[in-house]
Amino acid sequence: MNYSFTEKKRIRKSFAKRENVLEVPFLLATQIDSYAKFLQLENAFDKRTDDGLQAAFNSIFPIVSHNGYARLEFVHYTLGEPLFDIPECQLRGITYAAPLRARIRLVILDKEASKPTVKEVRENEVYMGEIPLMTPSGSFVINGTERVIVSQLHRSPGVFFEHDKGKTHSSGKLLFSARIIPYRGSWLDFEFDPKDLLYFRIDRRRKMPVTILLKALGYNNEQILDIFYDKETFYLSSNGVQTDLVADRLKGETAKVDILDKEGNVLVAKGKRITAKNIRDITNAGLTRLDVEPESLLGKALAADLIDSETGEVLASANDEITEELLAKFDINGVKEITTLYINELDQGAYISNTLRTDETAGRQAARVAIYRMMRPGEPPTEEAVEQLFNRLFFSEDSYDLSRVGRMKFNTRTYEQKLSEAQQNSWYGRLLNETFAGAADKGGYVLSVEDIVASIATLVELRNGHGEVDDIDHLGNRRVRSVGELTENQFRSGLARVERAVKERLNQAESENLMPHDLINAKPVSAAIKEFFGSSQLSQFMDQTNPLSEVTHKRRVSALGPGGLTRERAGFEVRDVHPTHYGRVCPIETPEGPNIGLINSLSVYARTNDYGFLETPYRRVIDGKVTEEIDYLSAIEEGRYVIAQANADLDSDGNLIGDLVTCREKGETIMATPDRVQYMDVATGQVVSVAASLIPFLEHDDANRALMGANMQRQAVPCLRPEKPMVGTGIERSVAVDSATAIVARRGGVVEYVDANRVVIRVHDDEATAGEVGVDIYNLVKFTRSNQSTNINQRPAVKAGDVLQRGDLVADGASTDFGELALGQNMTIAFMPWNGYNYEDSILISEKVAADDRYTSIHIEELNVVARDTKLGAEDITRDIPNLSERMQNRLDESGIVYIGAEVEAGDVLVGKVTPKGETQLTPEEKLLRAIFGEKASDVKDTSLRMPTGMSGTVIDVQVFTREGIQRDKRAQSIIDSELKRYRLDLNDQLRIFDNDAFDRIERMIVGQKANGGPMKLAKGSEITTEYLAGLPSRHDWFDIRLTDEDLAKQLELIKVSLQQKREEADELYEIKKKKLTQGDELQPGVQKMVKVFIAIKRRLQAGDKMAGRHGNKGVVSRILPVEDMPYMADGRPVDIVLNPLGVPSRMNIGQILEVHLGWAAKGIGERIDRMLKEQRKAGELREFLNRLYNGSGKKEDLDALTDEEIIELASNLRKGASFASPVFDGAKESEIREMLNLAYPSDDPEVEKLGFNDSKTQITLYDGRSGEAFDRKVTVGVMHYLKLHHLVDEKMHARSTGPYSLVTQQPLGGKAQFGGQRFGEMEVWALEAYGAAYTLQEMLTVKSDDVNGRTKMYENIVKGEHKIDAGMPESFNVLVKEIRSLGLDIDLERY
């Protein structure tokens, strides 16, 4: 087993019983792949597939003019380079985007020519706006903030059949309906009403009989009946009535007359039910016709028009009901044979026939006019308008698009379904197999007549009792629209607007000699893209609290958004967990509240296929043997197979063991024999999402609490010193690396140089391309603000000289420890009540935890101030502020901006700014005098940026932005100078590193080689030595050595060119940077200057902060207790946290107890290792102990592959506690936890005896810190990974004495953001009334609320020292009076 450089240092002991078959895939692949497919930057112009931008252009172009003599054709598109990189965009508040240019060709045809002849072709590039680019971590920078485009789970295009579950009609009758949903275009619905008539609707408008649509498609009554019915032929003669014998139709019927064979024997007596045996007898007797009673013809419908062959008179029309009068007419006219529709109550209903009778339209045109009137009421139905509307509804590619997915879904549901034998022989089978044979193959992305008829036929067949309705919550009927597809739709809608504008101008293209760029205005495209990324419901402000929240946000799928569901209309079924979610969508992670079940998270191994359906991987099973082959199956494909679970028992050869295996088939759990099994899950954690798979012992937690646990991990604030969880699940490394928080090596190499800002790696020769200077430089992110104001800071995790492989950890980020996700801290926890301080889930915590800064977090706030040009003059950022104390001014520099490093508190001035007062408009003379003698202090007011209330911290950065043409102040200039200086140093360092690396390579390459001559009179044929090279005046002289080996000489020349290019690149980069910094900044209109101040705030743990474990066990810190009062162990160690034991049984999250026990074992093992290292035990003893730890049970580790030095380093990294991995659904068993506890605390150890363990080593004796006495009974103590959540009391605590008031009601505003007061509501008033507290009540309702005069008077009284209230009229009464007047009632107050 090969361990990477990082893994060797801290191997996580895994309790997994099953080997990992499939590595956890790249977690952000859905986002990144989707957008890459949209842009297709990797593909050459002619190799681009019809996806994304290419598809959008192809769908709109060519644009043809109204007269047809000019057209615009699309050739290809190119994306330019973005002007600013990602950090610059964030700082400047702009979008990280690249300019899109399309090459467009204008073709003008000759009007005079008899056949289409090209007269002229003009071609050029057209700017089509800017397309936002995705960052390497799958997000977008829009207007300076990182955003995520969430994938949407919507109903797939196609045809769906369902019923109302008996809810519509009081009888509980099932009303069947069908709906054809296109990707773009009108919806077509078909539905039965309670009378079994079939109707259709377009776009949910008024319903009409379905036969109108069929007539509009060109069918007449006879053809309609011919499609939807089998026929019966009756032969009329003087002897009576006979019919053709169809054996299948007789089963279950009652014989109306005696059925006789040819000899006259009775086969079935009259009145008897016909059985299968009777049918066999009838068939064997060779009967072809049956006698029927003439009365049985009554009520039947004619299948076709009956026409008198002699006179040509229509005796009866198709679908006419046979009555006695009609029969008499037939008799008179000598009709010998009539064909009727075969209808029975059981499985051949008269639905279409009855609907046809309610339909009064005659013919195709009348039907189309009826549809036109329904779609466009009030408009005159001209023939042309009627035709155009009908054709554009479903048959025009411009207005209707079923899409590739929709066509595939449609065909599989209608043309390609499996039919029963009875259906094969019926009208339905004939329709699909004969009439519409081949319709599936020719179906494009618009509807055809066959498609509509096949949908109606399938619905009728459903009502007849054949087939099943669709489950709309099945993941085979819901697909994912990812970022690329969503952006493509927006881009297409923008292009469609452009098309309308272009068509108008195309007619003048020739006469005015226009070029393509004159015709196309790209503003609608830019506007559509900007609107989508800036304000769409699916474009969300990225949750960046910690790496997990970032990854989860990018893996989210939402059923909301445009074209999706709304919270109010979504029922229980849509929100519920569906069997097809297995391995695709997490059944646990979803928000609590109104969005529950509508917003979901992808499971760990899930991915989308080409059609947008979610797939999950399975191992193939052949004849009971599990193979290594892995197939990804969609929900529909999965329904065809029998799939075993990942924990099924296998023998050493991979064969399934046991007579029966637990499996899933068609969404049901079954027991199947091994030979029936076709697939098997790849991993036990396949079912859940990333957040849920980070919960150890998830299988022992109640689902509701696991949901809370998964959601709360996303709210964990990164601690100052991240600490890996002692008990993890093994997926922590994947999350840390894939989130791009931790940096991993792009290529293997040797660490050359490390400091806090960068890591330099010299790439291995075999990974560097020939002639390239193989150096990778990793610049680290330092103290940057995240979207949630948490601190993003990367720390090097390597030292100079370390040898790394590709994928090894280079630097840790926020909330990562050694490349593993570390959201909280490992706390020693005791489950016991303690003086009521852990009542109702409160948390009692030791002062030592706060003092050691275990839960201290750094938050970075960004404060902005802008200087505008007002009507009264320009605002000025200055140090010269009226009435500002010396203490305040000391922190400002000469430009009026706070120094970096200054410690500031609430109310301190950060940026001094004055605004001209608006008392008088100045005359030109006064303006001149002002300009000469300077401004008077009285004429400006202080509008400085001050530190907000309740906030204090340290200034860590200041950025000044100045509009083009306005002179920079000294501070702005010094910032630019220092930035350029730092950048130049960086470039020089890089060049030095490149130089050193290049010459090291050259030295290794040419020492010992023969030369044909060189500097310092090197003789021909002499060997190059190290001494010779060292003796040359400059290393650059090495390039003048003429080598005999031509290949080496070429490589030398390549390296020379490469170094020269690097120098030129560095100079170019410096010039670009300089230009960017020195040119003016783009600011909003009217803004002259903007200053951003970044303040780092240290938040220590305090009472009121919310904390939680990973099992949904949340609580609020009630008290931080002095360490000497905390319960302590026999050896004097106090516990860190005391939790309430009553929080466990009712919540049913037992996982936390198992985690505590295993964590306790991890800590004990760490202590044992620490003692061994302090006693300087030999590496052999350490190896033996670690062998017992890693290879006792669970996954075996190959410790023999490690050297003694690596064993000692591994041991020293485990000093604070061992690292365990308990994968979800395959975690540590109780026996394994006991085994670890015994290893950590051996019974023969005197230290262990002192702790007073119980027999199972799960509880110990604790002592009261205040009295020193032992508690009455033993207490469960252990180690749990505990998190501090983003709900910090510092950000919520708020108090007001006076402040702003509402303009209308004159009552104090509410909420911290408005500096509002506490709400005193209706119920609180009742309480004071109940107590009879009249004076308090009066005060609350008047001077403390909205009595304007009263509160002013009260303020005066307090100043004078008179403590009395003069309560007056509350403003709310005046508001009430005004509202009554607005209703037209005159109301006046009479004063007495």
From Swiss-Prot:
Name assigned to this protein: DNA-directed RNA polymerase subunit beta
Enzyme Commission identifier(s): 2.7.7.6
Q: Which reaction does it catalyse?
A: RNA(n) + a ribonucleoside 5'-triphosphate = RNA(n+1) + diphosphate
Q: Which InterPro entries match?
A: DNA-dir_RNA_pol_bsu_ext_1_sf, DNA-dir_RNA_pol_bsu_external_1, DNA-dir_RNA_pol_su2, DNA-dir_RNAP_su2_dom, DNA-dir_RNAP_su2_hyb_sf, RNA_pol_bsu_bac, RNA_pol_bsu_CS, RNA_pol_bsu_protrusion
Q: Record's Gene Ontology CC terms?
A: DNA-directed RNA polymerase complex
Quaternary structure, per UniProt, is:
The RNAP catalytic core consists of 2 alpha, 1 beta, 1 beta' and 1 omega subunit. When a sigma factor is associated with the core the holoenzyme is formed, which can initiate transcription.
Task: Kindly state a single biological-process term from the GO annotations of this entry.
Answer: DNA-templated transcription
Q: Cross-referenced HAMAP family, in alphabetical order?
A: RNApol_bact_RpoB
GO molecular function ontology, one term from the record? DNA-directed RNA polymerase activity
Which organism is the protein's source? Answer: Neisseria meningitidis serogroup B (strain ATCC BAA-335 / MC58)
Mind listing the UniProt keywords for this protein, alphabetically?
A: Antibiotic resistance, DNA-directed RNA polymerase, Nucleotidyltransferase, Transcription, Transferase
- Report the family membership: Belongs to the RNA polymerase beta chain family.
What is the role of this chain? DNA-dependent RNA polymerase catalyzes the transcription of DNA into RNA using the four ribonucleoside triphosphates as substrates.
**EC class (word):** transferase
